[in-house]
Amino acid sequence: MIRIAICGLHIESSTFTPYMSTAADFAQRRGQTLLERYPWITESPIPGIDQVPRAIAGEEWDVPTKRPWNHDVEWVPILHCSALPGGPVERLTYEKWRAEICDGLAKAGHVDGIFFDIHGAMSVPGYDDVEGDLISAIRDVVGPEPMVGASMDLHGNVSEKKLFAGCDLLTCYRMAPHEDAWVSRERAARTLCERLRSGKGKPIKAMVTVPILLPGEKTSTRLEPAASLYGMVPEVAAHDGVIDVGVWIGFAWADQPRCTAAVVGFGDDENRVRDGVSEIAQFFWKVRREFVFVAPTDGIEEAVDRAVASSRRPFVISDSGDNPGAGGADDVTIALSVLLTHPEITGGELSAIYASIYDPQVVKRADKAGVGGMVEVDLGGHVDTRKPGPVHLSARCVASLTILAACVRQCWESGGLASS
């Protein structure tokens, strides 16, 4: 029987937000709860598979409930913690979890492999490569023999000397937005199991760092040139002698040396693996200046002026600077303050929906007042305290979304959201 341990820490941390992520922000899974996270263990369909094109899904497209590659495999749960994007993780929290993972692996006895389920953009004060540090600590415990297969977000970072060196099989999502998150995890698990079962030993790896730093707003795989770039991945991965290839955009919202794009591949034919990785990396570099924002850009004052003057409705403005989907504080009030300077909005001539500002105290007060109730609040500006700070509002509660928020949280913790 093949024994494979499961562990990992999964969060996207912006180093430009003052918010610190704590243990309370994470769903912590151990034992049976951890095993039930993965559909190939529970013999369930892959979440979101109907949203993934056949070319991207590959062998996972028509996966049976009982995966043949998962036969006679013992999955050993260690620890997995995942959170919504946020700020850097408290150092003591990370070091506690690192110790728990290492202790768990030491007590687990012999394992043939490790399934390393990570994001790749976790930040911790005092560390410039958290995932690299974690895999190095794991290798110190288990040694060089167990085969490590890593599943990552394409907005993660691959450090050559630590993460790339410490893992044997690395793959990442092929879609942004990440509808294929669970397809990618399943591909990583299948590849690890099949490789261990084959008896061929560890594959040949190749990596090319691409000196590009791009935000997610420029790299949707639904648009060019990212569509063509990621379209190359399954084609190269299908070559004889190549097992898999991944393209990492990297993470723009952390000030760390490892933050850059990369292409990684592995297989048994060294020339084809290296040639395939090089081909994709060269195309990536060639089209680097073609990655553009999907809409016109402007300052917030100018953007609101344009929205008010426009005849197009609805008019959507996206503040990509305070982006909670990439770890922003989500309580910066600059845009709200600018909106409230326009009499067309404050006077009711135009309606505006502002989504969202993080302020749990305001939510509690609104919940207490109830639908239809009035509250006086100082909204936002409590986490990121830079000007203009909290905005004083007299507000009426028009709906209660507490149940919806609880459902979203539960869905995230159960692994039902594609980007979890």
How should each PLM-predicted stretch be described?
Residues 77-86, 117-119, 280-289:
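Gly-rich Lys/Arg/Thr-decorated short loops/hinges at beta-loop-alpha junctions or inter-strand turns
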Residues 59-69, 101, 105, 138, ...:
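Hydrophobic, Leu/Ile/Phe/Ala-enriched alpha-helical segments that form helix-helix packing faces
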Residues 53-105:
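Low-complexity, highly charged intrinsically disordered N-terminal segments
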Residues 1, 69-73, 103-114, 302-315:
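Glycine-rich phosphate/diphosphate-binding loops that line cofactor/substrate pockets in enzymes
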Residues 5, 9-12, 18, 89-98, ...:
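Active-site histidine-anchored catalytic micro-motif
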